From Swiss-Prot:
Keyword Mitochondrion: yes
Intracellular or extracellular location(s): Plastid, Chloroplast stroma; Mitochondrion
Gene: PDF1B
Keywords: Chloroplast, Hydrolase, Iron, Metal-binding, Mitochondrion, Plastid, Protein biosynthesis, Transit peptide
Protein name: Peptide deformylase 1B, chloroplastic/mitochondrial
Amino acid sequence: MAVCNCFLQAPPLSRILLPVLSRRATTLSAGYGRLKSTVTFCSTVNRTSPLTSSVRAEVKRVSRKDDKVASATDVQFETPLKIVEYPDPILRAKNKRIDIFDENLKNLVDAMFDVMYKTDGIGLSAPQVGLNVQLMVFNPAGEPGEGKEIVLVNPKIKKYSDKLVPFDEGCLSFPGIYAEVVRPQSVKIDARDITGERFSISLSRLPARIFQHEYDHLEGVLFFDRMTDQVLDSIREELEALEKKYEEKTGLPSPERVEARQKRKAGVGFGKR
C-alpha cells in the first residue's frame, strides 16, 4: 500500500493506516481508560515532520445547538453488531446527541470495541453499526489489552492545527479501499466520557487522524468526500462495486452514486484555529 513521500522515513507503525491497522501497539501518553477522562492524549511515535499541504479547503463550522437528543430506543442494539457498508443511507443520516449515560451505553461501547477488534479496525463510530447517535470508540493499537481504549460521546472540535497532512486512509464501511486524505495534524476536542463527565483533550498525529475520521462519520461525511478528484478516480470502480453490491443485497437502487458526485468542499477542520 503506497503512502505519500513525506512519510517514507517514518517508523513502520506510522505507515500503517486507519482504520484497518496491523496489531501493533503505539505508546500513548496519559492513563485514559473507558471510564476516565484526561486533558491530554497524543501519540509519542517519532516521525519526520510532515510537509504543509497546499490543498485549499473550506472551513466547515459546526453548531450542534439544534441537535436532537437520542431516546432510549435510539441506543437499543442487538449483538453481534454488524458493520454498515457504503452506500447505506444510515451513513449519511443525522446523528443524535446522547444524554442518557447508563448500563446500556456501557454495553454498547463494549460491543463496539468487540466488533472493531474482530474486523481489524482501530476506530469505529455508532452510525457504522447502525445507530445514529454521537458516539465513537478507538484504540490506535488495534488490539484488546494493548494501547488505550478511547470513548468519546457528543464530541465537538474546538481548534485544529494549520498544518495539513496527507495520509492514506481505509474505512471499515469501505472494505479493502484505501486512498489519500488530507487532514489537520492536531485537534482540540470537547466531549463527554462514558459516565457523562465533560472534558477536553488534545490529539495529534495518528490519534488525531483516527478521531477526525470517526468524527466525520458523526457528521454524515465519508472519507471520499475529502479526496481530490484525482484520488477519487483511483478508487471509483471499487466504490461503484459497493453500490452494485448494495443494490443486489437490498433490491433497492443505490441511494447515492459516485459517478454523479460533484466535488464536495468538505472542511478539513472545525471550530477555531
